[in-house]
Amino acid sequence: MARYTGPSCRLCRRENMELFLKGDRCYTDKCAIKRRNYPPGQHGQGRTKNSAYGIQLREKQKVRRIYGLMENQFRGYFAEADRMKGVTGENLLSLLERRLDNVVYRLGFASSRSESRQLVRHGHFTLNGKKVDIPSIQTRVGDVIELREKSRKIVSINDALDAVARRGIPQWLELDRDAFKGNLKALPVREDVTTPIQEQLVVELYSK
């Protein structure tokens, strides 16, 4: 499946909730879901009742879009989560949260996950002192993510760091704003994921 390149706001309207795909805009009255709270398209205002399968599919699509993944990537994460000990749905969320691009976003270096993914790809960060450019790297407890010296004057990054208080930093992460770095204090647990996600629906879908 090719990566979606259309308007991000259409995805929020499709899932009938804010996915926070456009950074600061999502916190303002300009957010599309606040102005047009119905699906996109000619017949969008006539919402239909979904079947059990349809509900599961929509939940999977919602989670996939929140983290900006293609179907094959997402299915791979589910397969890995299913092999791990513990609850599959919670394992899945933990794997998604520990992606490097998501950690960069959670620490406040970017206003959206798509922006954080681009920053990582362009080599603006180091992981444990080594330059990295792979957004999907799985971070571990004790890992240190630091903004490279040459990137510390980028306006968008500083604006995002100044605004992070509005979103908050999860308890499993720690940010040193003055040093432009953060670290993983612990593994994320289910309670750390505050986005309304029903991961069990995803498990049920892939278990068919």
From Swiss-Prot:
Q: Which InterPro entries match?
A: Ribosomal_uS4 (IPR022801), Ribosomal_uS4_bac-type (IPR005709), Ribosomal_uS4_CS (IPR018079), Ribosomal_uS4_N (IPR001912), S4_RNA-bd (IPR002942), S4_RNA-bd_sf (IPR036986)
Recorded GO CC terms: small ribosomal subunit
Read off the PROSITE patterns from this record: RIBOSOMAL_S4 (PS00632), S4 (PS50889)
Coiled-coil parts of chain: none
The cross-references to Gene3D superfamilies, in alphabetical order and at most eight, read:
Ribosomal Protein S4 Delta 41, Chain A, domain 1 (1.10.1050.10), RNA-binding S4 domain (3.10.290.10)
Q: Which residues form the S4 RNA-binding domain?
A: 98-159
The GO biological-process annotations, alphabetized, read as:
ribosomal small subunit biogenesis; translation
Which GO terms of the molecular function aspect are on file?
Answer: rRNA binding; structural constituent of ribosome
Q: What Pfam families does the record point to?
A: Ribosomal_S4, S4
Q: Which domain of life is it from?
A: Bacteria
Q: Keywords assigned by UniProt? A: Ribonucleoprotein, Ribosomal protein, RNA-binding, rRNA-binding
How does the annotation summarize its subunit structure?
Part of the 30S ribosomal subunit. Contacts protein S5. The interaction surface between S4 and S5 is involved in control of translational fidelity.
Family stated for the protein in its record: Belongs to the universal ribosomal protein uS4 family.
Q: What does this protein do?
A: One of the primary rRNA binding proteins, it binds directly to 16S rRNA where it nucleates assembly of the body of the 30S subunit.
What name does UniProt use for this protein?
Small ribosomal subunit protein uS4
Q: Which organism is it from?
A: Pelobacter propionicus (strain DSM 2379 / NBRC 103807 / OttBd1)
